Amino acid sequence: MTSIEELRVLPPLAVGRLGAAVEPMDNYTAETDPDQPLAPRRLRPAPTFRVDRTSGAITGVETPGELRFTDGQGKVRPVAPFLEVWALTDDHVLRPLTLDLLRLNGLTPGDVRWRVRVGNHKIQRRTYDDRDRIDADTEWFSDHAAHALNGLCPNFLEGRSLPLGHARYLQPTPGFPGVRLRFTPAGGHVYGSAYTDRPTDPDPNVVDFLYDATKGTWRGHADQAGDPRLTIPAQIYAGDDGPNGSWVSRGYLDDECDGLVHVKLEVSGRELTAFGRIGAGPPAYAPDSVPIRTVADELDQALSGPRATAGDTLEQARAVAEEVLRRATETVRLMNTEVMNGNTVDGRVDAASTMVRQDTADTGRLFEPIMAPSLVDTAAVLALHQNVLAALRSGTAPWFADVLRDHDEVGDLTAKGRRKMPALMRGADGRSLALTRRQVDLVRLAARQAIFRQDTDDPEVPR
Amino acid sequence: MPELFEDQAPAVAALSVAGSLGAEEKRPVLPPEFNWRDYTVMLLHVAAEIEHSLMVQYLFAAYSMGGPQVPEARRDDVRRWQEVVLGIAKEEMGHLVTVQNLLTALGAPVNLDREDYPWGSDFYPFPFTLRPFSATSLAAYVVAESPETWSGPKADEIKRVAFESTGQYVNRVGALYSRVDAILKDEEFLPDESFHAGTLPYQASWDEWGRGYTRGERGQDSGNVPDVKSPELLVFGVFSRDSARRALHEIGEQGEAPDADLEDETSHFNRFLGIYEELTAWPEGDQALVSRPVAQNPVTEHRLDESEVAALGVAEVTTSPITDPVTALWGHLFNLRYRMLLTDISHAFRLAGPVDNGGVLTGRGALVHRAFAEMYNLRALAGRLVDLPLERDAPDGPRAGPPFEMPYSLELPHHDHDRWLLQRDLVQASRLLTDQLLSTDPSCGGDPYLVALRESDQRALEQVEHILSRKGCTR
């Protein structure tokens, strides 16, 4: 039997990326070059759905000959993820929801109903004014038109809304019979705040004025020192120096968002529902690099717990250790380590927003570089990471578990604590970044185990 | 044993100078051909070689530990011990660079040399021997690091085992340091102006060399293995008589804890002793399985396989030639990277670090990082060598192990430009070896480590070429 019992939206979390080009970004993979294992990952074009703009149907699958991240006119191509509906049928199999499966249950694509709700609450997070919340809601729909995600906000200028992209229920066809929704993020623009009781100077940074700076407080807002509700660190918005060391907001808005994709289907008198999460972030300007701690790592930890489990093989643990090092190498490649370390730059002390500034501001401690200033020449640090990665590929046990920062060491401001890895980087709480507990534990597992191996050992034996 | 203290007139050659710790109230006597400053420098040269050779022997022992033959129930212990021995070796590296700092502060050249076979000088604890980890080799380390006050039945027993395993009474490392201290503390021997504070920017600092290991924070868990404390890397800058004495005192204490309670777990002596007691409590059958079947003193040169009798009537030192052709290539690669490590350290001492917050950087930081990278390479290569056959056509015979052979010279060219030429030579030599390994042996074709090493050498070559092409590189 193939009676539909439950629904799922897969992937459960999809991250889009902003871009103003009309055509979304093609699919690609990032692979390690076996002949140059220390080099950045190579991007390889991958099979990509082509969607007919008129009908909303997938017309084919193409693997592009080359990858282009812009449309050639200076506009970035957005990453527009597909969300698929899967069904758990009465034989306990999770399978894609298709035209056939719908038909077997006496349903058509028109019976599938969608609703997308996204928001951008960045202003409200800082002003604590609920009228600064920006929300968009498509309401329920079953058609295949593009549904604009228009962000509405009580403190906007009359009749204005923030474009947050659009969602489209793709029309299933015999060739591509799956039930899918595509989320296309917004263009990646900066919007401004205008006064209604006085003239507003033009601003070359903004494409339009949306926010009513007379009605709301966002333009001219300054975080109040000592307020326990502040973001950590505070003052992370576009602004200018104000009186008494304050940081005064210019009233800018971006068009990022995140929210929920709901799907609903009535089967044999029962209403089945499911939802997935979507978000839109800035474009990937280093698409051949992976951050050292990703959402995927968080999900892995949520799924498997903070420790290595009995099911984790030594080989997996070693792979995690190597991946951590690879990402660290990719990250160093993108950093100006001399500046990030708090070295004097062209005679300037405190030349940028760094963990050194953070440590100094939070504790009143002396502005003190993190690593020995002689050690942070960017080329030398990059070479060091590449060398560690090379040595790790020999199969020797990772030896650097010692210097990984534990989750409960993020506030350790001793020299040893500040120098732990990942170094020079900030976590979400304004203190030094740490890997997930599970990442650290897997590296330690590999560190403990690897000396008993022999090259002939079967690598995939669970512990 | 003749002594160069005033109550015993000097009767023998200069190097026969082992004093005892209890001799603090005695005044050292100057041997012929020296003044006090030069004599101090000579003793520090010996100290550097001792620290260097202990470090290498401990590393060899640590690398030999483990292997598939270790019983499952024993693995946690073996991995823990290995971490302890590696930690002690790392601390010896700290001692080694601190001795270089002392030499630098006195205006003397650094010394990264190491006596190869044969072995002789009565300050050296025991004949230099690369041996797989075992209860008998461990006994020698316990005695070498022991405080003068260590006695009793247990001490006698371990000293007996050490004697049998080395063929001589094992000298205590501490004896040399107390001799140096007896000179340092006396203004008549070395006036204050002998200590050049201006050399500090050239000296190794903990901030550069400590790599996140503890500094004076005992008792932090190491992250690699549960219940093993992080090593405590001591790197002291020397800028005065007091700082010189403190550096030596701390090094001595970390070795043998002369002033500490014998139960103090922080000294090398107590850590080695603890492992010795745990290991000897095992059944003998299990004891024999703690290490891989690694040969003693593996060498890449095709010497005749015969015993060389070392000086001073010590035990015979037997070298084990690596005759398997592929293993020999790995051994040569190991020796070359060892040479690169010593060159990087030595080169780093020739360049000043920034005296402020690094507004202008020299190549020093890059050299320090390269030195650490070579340590990681040595670890990786040793991991290969303890798994590769020593002898041609004996695939199931003894394993090779890392040879740690000294280069023909450690001298650096006078001009910085020419030092970078040497660096380039070494990288190119490594490329030749890796290419040879990758192309000639099917078992190495596509070896992920060799492929990565080749690439990192290529990148290093580009960096060296960049330095050589810069106008800032002086001739």
Model-identified regions with their sequence ranges:
Chain B
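Non-heme di-metal
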Residues: M1-R475
